[in-house]
UniProtKB/Swiss-Prot annotation:
UniProt cross-references to SUPFAM superfamilies, sorted A to Z: DTD-like (SSF69500)
Catalyses which reaction(s): glycyl-tRNA(Ala) + H2O = tRNA(Ala) + glycine + H(+); a D-aminoacyl-tRNA + H2O = a tRNA + a D-alpha-amino acid + H(+)
Pfam families: Tyr_Deacylase
EC number of this enzyme: 3.1.1.96
UniProt keyword list: Cytoplasm, Hydrolase, RNA-binding, tRNA-binding
Role noted for this protein: An aminoacyl-tRNA editing enzyme that deacylates mischarged D-aminoacyl-tRNAs. Also deacylates mischarged glycyl-tRNA(Ala), protecting cells against glycine mischarging by AlaRS. Acts via tRNA-based rather than protein-based catalysis; rejects L-amino acids rather than detecting D-amino acids in the active site. By recycling D-aminoacyl-tRNA to D-amino acids and free tRNA molecules, this enzyme counteracts the toxicity associated with the formation of D-aminoacyl-tRNA entities in vivo and helps enforce protein L-homochirality.
Enzyme's top EC category: hydrolase
One CC-aspect GO term: cytoplasm
Organism: Kineococcus radiotolerans (strain ATCC BAA-149 / DSM 14245 / SRS30216)
InterPro entries linked to this entry: Daa-tRNA_deacyls_DTD, DTD-like_sf
Name the record gives this protein: D-aminoacyl-tRNA deacylase
Length: 141
């Protein structure tokens, strides 16, 4: 499981002109990719890392202040660009495997006391954000 975690002042996801998820105020935008061998252990590890990562102002973690999280599934985090100019996504888990794990990460983050909004799995989404810092961290679990 791979996550790109961005500290944001605001972020939102739009599908076909409709806002399906948004955070206002200091929080995190998490782009999440799932690979074939991910399971419950990776769900718990990535959720704990996101919740406890001290990247908010004042060296605080999202769990310390109840910061909102916008979680967006993104299979392209597992792009393989080693050959040619066209990436492949063979390392990304198929939707029927990935979707329940993305949902489980959202639930695990809520279990850490965080308000969580999400994108729409499998949809063509427009993600808008204001990166604060900018601060962007790559996590692997």
């Amino acid at each position: 499981m791979r996550a790109v975690v961005q500290r944001v002042t605001r972020a939102r996801v739009t599908v076909e002109g409709e806002v399906v998820g948004a955070v206002d105020g200091p929080g995190l935008l998490v782009l999440l990719g799932v690979t074939h061998d991910d399971g419950p252990a990776q769900v718990e590890l990535i959720a704990r890392k996101v919740a406890q990562l001290r990247i908010l102002r004042g060296e605080r973690a999202a769990a310390d202040v109840g910061a909102p999280v916008l979680l967006v599934s993104q299979f392209t985090l597992y792009a393989d660009t080693r050959k040619g100019r066209r990436p492949t996504w063979n390392a990304a888990a198929p939707g029927d495997v990935a979707q329940p794990l993305v949902d489980a990460v959202a639930d695990a983050l809520r279990g850490h006391g965080l308000p969580v909004e999400t994108g729409r799995f499998g949809a063509d989404m427009a993600v808008e954000l204001v990166n604060d810092g900018p601060t962007t961290i790559l996590l692997d679990a």
